Structures are given as C-alpha cells and as structure tokens.
C-alpha cells in the first residue's frame, strides 16, 4: 500500500509539473503571438521594411525577434546588426562612470585636466578673458549636455568630418559656446565625442577596445562593436541591416551618410545583444553574475541635474510613458532609427531597432509602436488607431499634384497677367512677383528655421533624407515659382510701367 501511495504521489507531482510547464509555455506562446500580431500589423500600416525587437523583464528575456516585410530582400533576424546611433551615448557614459568609480576621473574636474588640447572659440557675450570658458567645462557638464556648446555655435554635420577621436577634439577650437557651462541644456553630439577621448587618454586604450573589454564582453554582447566612422561600421559589421529612406509613404533602400560617429553614435548592435544591455540597465548595473559598476552610478546616469530645467541625465532622458516613469533614448541616423525605453518601477526594458528612418515615421509610427508595446506589457492589449504613414504619403502626393497644377496654371496665365500690368497698382504687381519667390526663399532658409525651433542644425542634404517627400514638394514649388517670377520680371521690364516710374 505504501508503495502504491508513493507511486500515486510521484504521478500527481509529475502531472502538476507538466501542467505548470504547459500553462507557462502556452502563456509565453500567447504573449509572443500578441507581440507578433501587433508588430506585423504596424509594419504593414506604416510600410516599415524591417525591425528587430527585444523585450526584457527583471533578468529574463521575454521576447527577441527580427521582423521583415514580405518583399524584403534582406530579412531581419535577432542577430542582424544595426547602427543604434545616439543610444551609443549611454555606453560612453558607462565607460566614464567606470573610470570615476576607479578614481581615475573626477566628474567635477575640468575637461582640460585630462585633455589640455580641449579649447573653444571664446564668445563675445561671456565678457571673460580668453580661455576662461573652456577651462570651466567639466566632465559632468559634458555628460549632462550642459557644456554651453550647441549645433548653433558648431554645426558639426556641415563641417569637414573628423576621422579619429583626437581630430574631433581639436576641431572644437572652432566651436563657439552659446551659454556659460552648466547654465542650460543643449543636445550636442561632440560632448560625448570628447568624453570618448577622455576615456582613451585615462584608460590608455583605444575607445573601441575599452568598450569591448569592459562592457561588450562582460555583457556577452558578442555581435556588438564600436565604429569611429560610418565606413568603419560597414567594414566591422558582418551582418549589417540595409538602411532605407521613405518618400510618399514608400520605403526604398539607400546607403547611410558617411561621417564621424564614435562616442556619440558609433555602436553597432543586435536585438539579441541589446536584450542583455536592457537587463543590465534595469537590474542596478548587474547582468547575471557580472556587475559593471554600482547601483548609485546607474541612478546618477538616469537622473537629470536639479540645478537647471532639463530631463537629460547621462546618456538618458527621464520622462513618462502611460503615467509611469520611463528612462529612454532614441537614436537617429538618416536610414536607421533606434528606440530604447526602460520602465524602472516594473523592470521592463524595450529596444526597437529599425532599418529605416523618415520624419513622418518619427512623428507618427515609431511612437505608436513604442506606446503600443508598453500598453501590451502592462494591460495585455496594445492601443489601436493613430494616423497611418501610408495615408500621409498619399496626402503629400495629392498636395504636390495640386501645387504643381496651380503653378502650371499660373504660368499659362502669364499672357493675361502681362496685359493687366497697366491696370494694376505697381505695389500689387511687385507683391505678386515677390510671392512667386517665397517657396525658394523658404527652401533656402529652412535649415536655420529648424535650428531656431529645435536647437539642432540640419543642412539641406539631411533634410532631404529625413523628409524627402516634403522637400521634393517644396523644391518643385520653388523651381516653378522662380520660373514664374523671372518671367513676370521680364514682362515688367519690357513694359513701360518701369519707364514711367523712373
């Protein structure tokens, strides 16, 4: 009887274990299926050619997978490599904080204590002796993006691109501060590029080697690397995603721009590797048995300075998603986009790596996908709806057709306009001619308008890449407007109205 009883207990225990595992597996399958349905639906709605996704909770990977459109010739997997752009800044901040904990860097020491060659163009507003401003910029200022430097005083994307970290530091001798150090937040890529050079000098290792030894290898990020330039990224990556641009809601493959990246945007990674990074970030700086630095350093990196109005910590923005504190950062290149968000309260982490970028996607699609995933994690159901980038493309195409039609109609009306010159007040004639040149004038000054609004300077090439359909529409309007305006000026010059005025 005792033997039979023991056999029954063993059978029931095994049944409970099997049932538990089955329910767990079924639950995981339901979760994965829900994620898959949501992502594929969003990709179809917004014509996204490919993305890779990693979701973690506590010290577990919940989901890691690559997704591709049906007609994609370069299928995306969890091992596909992406340029993660400005998400790289948090890795640079980790390197600095490791050296701070090793007492090799002092956050409040001047940058010049480590890089004597660090020098800026002294601004006239400061009314201080030459060399005073750059001598006051500290390591903490660079990390918090409050160095006083900005794209307005140093439009680095429009200048000759450095090929080494040392060249980037010396190129800042042309940079004009726009604020005193510590006074105000200005997002400025070279802040983190200077920090990369500080890491090199203090550690006596090339920056890429330092990251590999002290961050990538301990976190088992085997397919992750740091590139100094875009060309280095292509040479170093063995499975790089094909980047894309978008026009009128339609994606097309296009090479990424060349340029300098290291320190601010040079890391190449995969969804699989980023899952390990998310676990490290949401677990107080620990991954499995590896602890890269203290919990206090993680908290400091995630916390904006209190002395000024800023949401930027050290490589991270602090915000909110669905009413909950979120630590996040995106990464933007012309053909790649990355979204990383940490929910510290519940220890969730999400990394989205896209092989496409365009302003409509940044404004509409990418936020919808990020928010939908967060809602799916918290409520089990993502939000639906939102404006489709495909509809946006149709709307812009229609707007372009209407604009071109009206411009051609105006050109065809020129003979009648010429005859009406004598019956129209001269000021109205000049006003009408001036209006024809407005699109061209607006197109010319657009980079400075963006700089005024966003504190970032993007030249015409970058603007064309980021919003190709809008820029094409504006360019066509500008060309037709200039042709119209020149024709009217010629007609006016040949009339006797100008002779009468003179």
Language model features: what each stretch is:
Residues 26-51, 55-57, 255-502:
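Catalytic loop of the DD-peptidase/beta-lactamase superfamily, centered on the K-T-G motif
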Residues 82-85, 185-187:
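Catalytic tyrosine of NAD(P)H-dependent dehydrogenase/reductases that use a Tyr as the general acid/base
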